[in-house]
Amino acid sequence: MAGHSKWANIKHRKARQDAVKGKVFTKIIREIVSAAKQGDPDPDKNPRLRAVIEKALSVNMTRDTINRAVARGTGGDDNDNMDEVSYEGYGIGGVAVLVETMTDNLNRTVSEVRHAFTKNDGNLGTTGSVAYLFNKRGEISFNDTSLEDEVMLVALDAGALDIENDGESLLVITEWENFGHVKDALNAAGLVSDNAEVTMSPSTSAEIDNVADAEKVMKMIDMLEDIDDVQEVYSNVNFSDEVMAQLEQ
C-alpha cells in the first residue's frame, strides 16, 4: 500500500502536468468514445463508461465535453474505430509494465512502445508475460484515516471488497464493475474521496533501491506515457524511501 501510494503520487503529478498540455483530455475523450461505442451510452449500465467519466471529471473535464464524446461514440462514425491493444514488458530491475493503447496504426504503436522499452534497458515481452501480475479493480482513497469506521461501514455495505489503512491514508478496494456504485454510496454519506479510479493493481512489487535504476524506470514510463496512442501505463515498481526522497527533490 505504501509503495502504491508513493507511485500514485508521482503519476498524479505527471497527470496534472499533461492536463495542462491537453494530452490527458485527448486520451480520455478517445476512451469515452470507445466505451460508448462498444457498450450502453448510459454510464449506469456501462461500468467501463462510468469509470472513464469519473476519470474525466477528476481532471476537470466539463460535462459538456464528456457528453459530446459519448454522442460521438453512439453516432457510429467509422472514423472513430480504433484497435485496443495491450503491450507487456519489463524494465530494469525486473519491473513489470503493462501498457494499454488505442490506435489506428498497430505498426506505428508497437514500434514506439518497443523503442521506449529498449531505450531504457527494458524489453517488450509477449502477450501474457506480465498481465497475470495485475488485477483490474476500483480504488477509492481518503487521506483522512480518522474516517476509517465510517468509510468501512458504508463501503462494505455497498459491496466493497476490502479497506486498507497504512497509517497515512485509507484505500477502498472494489470490483471494477462495482466501482461506481461504491463511490456513489460514499458520496451520498458525505464521504468524498481524495482520489478514485479503476486501475490495474499489481499483485507483487519490484523493489528499486538505487537512484540510477529508479530514474531509468521513470524515464521509460514517461516515454511510454508520452506516446499519443498510449492510454495507460501500469507498473509494479516500488521505490525505497531513500530513493523516493531523492526523486522528489
Curated annotation (Swiss-Prot):
InterPro entries: Integrase-like_N, TACO1_YebC-like_2nd/3rd_dom, TACO1_YebC_N, Transcrip_reg_TACO1-like, Transcrip_reg_TACO1-like_dom3, YebC-like
Tagged with keyword Cytoplasm: yes
GO MF assignments: DNA binding
Protein name: Probable transcriptional regulatory protein Pcryo_1479
GO cellular component: cytosol
Species the sequence originates in: Psychrobacter cryohalolentis (strain ATCC BAA-1226 / DSM 17306 / VKM B-2378 / K5)
Pfam families: TACO1_YebC_N, Transcrip_reg
GO biological process, one term: regulation of DNA-templated transcription
Location relative to the cell: Cytoplasm
Family: Belongs to the TACO1 family.
Keywords carried by this UniProt record: Cytoplasm, DNA-binding, Transcription, Transcription regulation
Keyword DNA-binding: yes
